Amino acid sequence: LPIKGMIGLSLGEYVALIASNALSFEEGIKLVADRAHFMQQDADREISTLAAVLDPQLQEIQELITAQQENNQRVYIANYNSPQQIVVGGTLTDLKATLKKIEEDNLAKRTILLKVNGAFHTPFFNGARQQMHNRLQTVDFHEPQIEVISNTTNSLFHCEDLPGILEKQLAVPTHFGANVKELVKHAKIDTTLEIGPGKTLSRFAHQVDQQLNTQHIENLADYEKFIKEQKD
């Protein structure tokens, strides 16, 4: 298939980089295992969590969170997934206070506390970020053979940028929605193929651009069906 570009959300970014030959499969597996270990250490050190915010009034929520931070509340936007969903993280107390304010001010259709043990992609994971900085210096990276757009910068990965961006990714927001827009604009795509369990990313992609033909492969049967359809 003529693949024009790839995106992976959070951990999935490593899958995209492996598929693009920016790093080997063996090195990639070791690297994500170490990444998980570093993140678990931060998660154990201080309790934090995430909440999804559906149909957000983004500018108003950004202003609210800035005000909360100025009031010494530890709450941050963690993921900009699509025009219809962002994810906010923080300590449980501060996060609940922020969600309550969002609901009182009608700044979103709905908020949902997520069952996770960390406010990923926020400063709560600065410790893991520092450990990844050191670990990434040992990795033999290569120029991606297929273009991969970074969650962090919304620009194409290049070999020399990989260590710095992957380190930073742990503690700053992801921008999947903007990544999809960039892929449509830069690579002129009209079809996306999500590989993995569930169809969450396909849903985000469709929310970004309703003209996209979103396809999904979850298992071998899906793969064989997809390949047959392409041949036909």
Report residues per predicted region.
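Acyltransferase/transacylase module recognition
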Residues: L1, D140-D232
